[in-house]
């Protein structure tokens, strides 16, 4: 599992590891850190990791087909949402659907736990331990956003909110010249 050493990338994975949610799903997780958003896709392409965190800045590569999103996550702040995801190479989904379903179940259970403000301190400690960072700094990052749970994410998927966020993100990439043309969000 490729991740960036920050709260946004790690909060759900760190929680799933420390609470035993991956283990419940029969998954043995090995973490690989990367420093630049684009590097996660490179790690997958090289075979170093099967899945990687894909931050909002690199979703343009998913639009271009370099990676496929299998699990979404949002950080909501006021009127905006950062669309973050867990992705894999396009062919990995078909060959490893069972693994991805179990990974997603563990992440969603971790999101349900870690999105509760009462648990921010604990989750910040998990992230700090993995990153070798200061817990207080990670806790500040936790307080910067509204981390959603799986129920809210599924509601956003069902009512079209997630699609609207992704369409807005795609439009921003097109307007900035980072993506040439619009593609169906469902892809």
Where are the model-predicted features located?
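Secondary-structure end/capping motifs
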Residues: 96-180
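Short glycine/serine- and small hydrophobic-enriched flexible loop segments
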Residues: 18, 91, 108-112
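A bilobed periplasmic-binding-protein/Venus flytrap-type ligand-binding module shared by bacterial periplasmic
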Residues: 15-16, 82-97
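Intrinsically disordered, low-complexity polar segments
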Residues: 180-187
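Short, glycine-/small- and polar/acidic-enriched structural segments
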Residues: 1-81
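Conserved aromatic
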Residues: 34-35, 93, 117
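A glycine-rich, aromatic-flanked flexible loop/lid motif
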Residues: 78-83, 141-143
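Hinge/capping helix and adjacent helix->loop/strand transition within the periplasmic-binding protein
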Residues: 23, 77, 93-98, 102
